[in-house]
Every structure is written in C-alpha cells, then in structure tokens.
Design a protein with these regions (language model features):
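Jelly-roll (double-stranded beta-helix
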Residues: 1-236
Length: 236
C-alpha cells in the first residue's frame, strides 16, 4: 500500500512569530486519520521569526530530531545539551524519563526554517541524552547517507528505535534507489526541490508512505537546483 500525503493537505498553524506545517496531528491541528506512521509521530516544518522561539517546555519518552534548512536554531536543555544548529546539521535529543528544553531563532534579523521530527522510542524512561552531527553535502549528492540509526550501529546519530533516517541531495536526472522490504514501513519526505518517486512527481513538503511494499524505490531529481529528501526506514 502506498499512502499519499501532499504538502497542501498538511495542517497549517500560524501565530505572530511562528508558521508551521504539520504532516501529522500536533498541537492545535488534529486529524484522527493522521496520528503518525508506525513509530514516526511528528514531522513539523516550522518557520520562526527573528529573535522568537519556544520557551522552556518538557518532553518525555520521545526521540526528537531537528533538521535546519535555513538560518540557525539555538537549543538548550536540562540534560546539559545546547548549541546552535545550522543547515547541514542534525540534532538529536532523546527525552527519556523527562527533559526540559527551549528552542529559539539564533538570529535577531533573519527567520529560521527547520523540520522537527519525533520518533517514538523502543524503550521508556531511559536517561535523557543529546547529540549533534554535521553531514557533508557532498556525501549525499546522488547517494543515500545515514543521518541516524538504531543506537548508531549503521552510522549517524544513535536514536533509540529500530529505525534509520537517510538523506539524499538530487540534481536533475540524478537517480538513487532503495530496496523496500514488505516487513518494514517507509516514509519519504521531500524537504525541498522536485523529484519523481517511481514515476510519481513530488515537490517540497510532499510525502509518500509505504506499507507492505517490496521491490525498488527509485528517486529521480527534477527541476533546477538540488532536491533535499529524507527517507525513514521504520519497524512495522
């Protein structure tokens, strides 16, 4: 089964300093048909005004990934983690038995544009932890790079779930493949740009879910510039 999630169908929330697009139900946006996909619970595309952000708030038992597209995102948490996340970097905070954190635009002049991703962990009430990793764009040009994986065994950040988060950057006519296993779930999210996925045209914010599907997923870059694409390989 292939599930389509067009960008235009996502939830949309706007406040004075925040504009968010929600792939799945979150906060003020609720749709019982879109509560998540396997352990993938949240993909929020956020734009935060200069100098603004999320004051200290608490999370527990969630793997939280932040992926910055433009600008800088300043993070502080009660586990001792903190810093500024820039484009090309991924931040991981495992909330464990409970952690308080804040996120603010690191600039007083320019907005920050980022994805926040939540994955439910495979264990509960572990100790909170934090890490941040930079990824060379050249390693993703026309190829998959592992950005996060189960306890870091396959590379990338060491999330607490039997999952892999992969990324690629595709110029026009560049092709990457991924083998689908019917015993796994897959969620494909176009961060920016244009691609075709097994012949289906997709643009920024569009997503496809794959359940009980086997065979080859082939992505082809389209349009100008490079498309930025994430793939989540998840337990069923």
């Amino acid at each position: 089964m292939i599930i389509e999630r067009p960008s235009s169908a996502r939830g949309h929330v706007r406040t004075g300093w925040l504009e968010s697009r929600h792939t799945f139900s979150f906060g003020h946006y609720y749709d019982k048909a879109w509560m998540g996909f396997g352990p993938l619970r949240v993909i929020n595309e956020d734009r935060v005004a200069p100098g603004a952000g999320f004051p200290p708030h608490r999370h527990a038992n969630m793997e939280i990934l932040s992926y910055v597209l433009e600008g800088g995102l300043s993070h502080q948490d009660s586990s001792g983690g903190g810093g500024v996340i820039r484009p090309g970097e991924l931040q991981w905070m495992s909330a464990g038995h409970g952690v308080e954190h804040s996120e603010f635009n690191a600039s007083q002049d320019a907005p920050v544009h980022f994805l926040q991703i939540w994955i439910q962990p495979d264990r509960v009430n572990a100790a909170p932890t934090y890490a941040q990793q930079a990824f060379e764009p050249a390693d993703r040009h026309g190829a998959w790079a592992t950005l996060a994986s189960a306890d870091g065994r396959a590379g990338g950040l060491p999330i607490r779930q039997d999952a892999r988060v992969l990324g690629t950057l595709l110029a026009a006519d560049e092709v990457v493949d991924y083998a689908l296993d019917a015993g796994r779930l897959y969620w494909l999210h176009v961060v920016s740009g244009e691609i075709e996925a097994n012949g289906r045209p997709l643009t920024a914010g569009d997503a496809l879910g794959f359940a009980d599907e086997a065979g080859r997923l082939q992505l082809t870059g389209r349009g100008t510039g490079r498309a930025d694409v994430l793939l989540f390989d998840l337990p069923h």
